[in-house]
Amino acid sequence: VWGGDWNQALEGTDYVGTRAGRAAITDLLEASRLSLPTRSLGSATPGHRSIDHIAVPMTWDVLAAWRIPAEVRGRRLSDHDAYVVSIKD
């Protein structure tokens, strides 16, 4: 499992990364046989894709991936949200 703040959206418009960075990460994921269930998830900024990701082995059965807003009573705790991937065990 490889996860964290990659500073790179991997689909849609990329507001912080680069095309070269996106290509390098995509190539590495393929070479490492990792899938990216968080690829299509949004971020704390409406209309933006996540730059935080969780990659898992392609052989894992991913049930779902979702974003948990990092806020309490409308107050942001971080500029990044939390991301979760559920797998079948």
Where are these regions (language model features)?
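Metal-dependent phosphoester-hydrolase catalytic domains
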Residues: 8-89
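Active-site flanking residues adjacent to catalytic metal/cofactor-binding acidic residues
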Residues: 3-5
